[in-house]
């Protein structure tokens, strides 16, 4: 696959306060990098907990929550891309070894935090993309489902497998999977705990794109970045408002959804970007959107 040249800034580790980490390279399990040059506007979140295959433990969740809280206020983030620093794995789901040490009350509190994390990802104002280059099981797939778009390697393995462990999806899987695939198919996948390949997931519509894995093991990331590059030139305010209209509109009846669309459209009318788009069309040139 042809790789597009881009300028890379260093990964910036985020350390959760008062927590010990088993992440690589300095101990942070969540790292952030803003791309530069032609890819400026794309921000990447690297999940990097190799000892536990990016399992959703306390430190991991705390760092990711803090990272999202910081990034959601940054208007320079036009696309947020989730990727893994652990080869062959996107996210292995819940940290069951850590879970075994919790009381029943602590389990309930932690799962509520997980649900809040997935809601924060879903509510992120800019488009989000999950690059699934390996296993995405249980909570790992729930994390991907919380993203707007999903790209998978054809060899990736994913599924809501909680029922095979005596559990049920508790971080949004029972709600987001049927909204993605329909009720009957979601029930089948959850009831059976079935695992899907990236290719099978693409056929069902669970992922937007499935690509053959490369030698480096990052084919899904490369395709996800190319998808982010398609979003970058578009008017960022219009894109964000389009996300709001879709997300909120699909939760209500169509008449209410049309009203939501109208409110979002009204917010976009006074923007400089709308005027720039009209001027560029009239002058037969490429628009230069600034997000204002």
Curated annotation (Swiss-Prot):
Cell compartments where the protein resides: Mitochondrion
Gene Ontology biological process terms, A to Z: fatty acid beta-oxidation
Transmembrane regions listed in the UniProt entry: none
GO cellular component annotations of the record: mitochondrion
Lineage: Eukaryota, Metazoa, Chordata, Craniata, Vertebrata
Gene Ontology molecular-function annotations: lyase activity
Pfam families reported for this sequence: ECH_1
Residues found modified as N6-succinyllysine: 97
Name this polypeptide is given: Enoyl-CoA hydratase domain-containing protein 2, mitochondrial
InterPro entries, sorted: ClpP/crotonase-like_dom_sf (IPR029045), Enoyl-CoA_hyd/isom_CS (IPR018376), Enoyl-CoA_hydra/iso (IPR001753), Enoyl-CoA_hydra_C (IPR014748)
Transit peptide: first to last position: 1-35
N6-acetyllysine, modified sites: 97
UniProt site positions, description: Important for catalytic activity: 142, 162
Organism (species): Homo sapiens
Family the UniProt entry places it in: Belongs to the enoyl-CoA hydratase/isomerase family.
């Amino acid at each position: 696959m042809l790789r597009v040249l881009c300028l890379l800034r260093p990964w910036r580790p985020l350390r959760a306060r008062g927590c010990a980490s088993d992440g690589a390279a300095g101990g942070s399990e969540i790292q952030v990098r803003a791309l530069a040059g032609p890819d400026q506007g794309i921000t990447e979140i690297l999940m990097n907990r190799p000892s536990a295959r990016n399992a959703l433990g306390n430190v991991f969740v705390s760092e990711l929550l803090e990272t999202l809280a910081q990034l959601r206020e940054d208007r320079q983030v036009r696309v947020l891309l989730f990727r893994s620093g652990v080869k062959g794995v996107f996210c292995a789901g819940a940290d069951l070894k850590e879970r075994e040490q919790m009381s029943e009350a602590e389990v309930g509190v932690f799962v509520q935090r997980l649900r809040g994390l997935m809601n924060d990802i879903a509510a992120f104002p800019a488009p989000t993309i999950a690059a699934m280059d390996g296993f995405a099981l249980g909570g790992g797939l729930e994390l991907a489902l919380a993203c707007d778009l999903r790209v998978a390697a054809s060899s990736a393995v994913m599924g809501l497998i909680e029922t095979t462990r005596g559990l049920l999806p508790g971080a949004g899987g029972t709600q987001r999977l049927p909204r993605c695939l329909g009720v009957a198919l979601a029930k089948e996948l959850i009831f059976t705990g079935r695992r899907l390949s990236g290719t099978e997931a693409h056929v069902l519509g669970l992922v937007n794109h499935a690509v053959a894995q490369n030698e480096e093991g990052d084919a899904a990331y490369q395709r996800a970045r190319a998808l982010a590059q398609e979003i970058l030139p578009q008017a960022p305010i219009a894109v964000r408002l389009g996300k709001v209209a879709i997300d909120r509109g699909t939760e209500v009846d169509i008449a209410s959804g049309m009203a939501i669309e109208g409110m979002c459209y009204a917010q976009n009318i006074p923007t400089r970007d709308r005027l720039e788009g009209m001027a560029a069309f009239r002058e037969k040139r490429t628009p230069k959107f600034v997000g204002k």
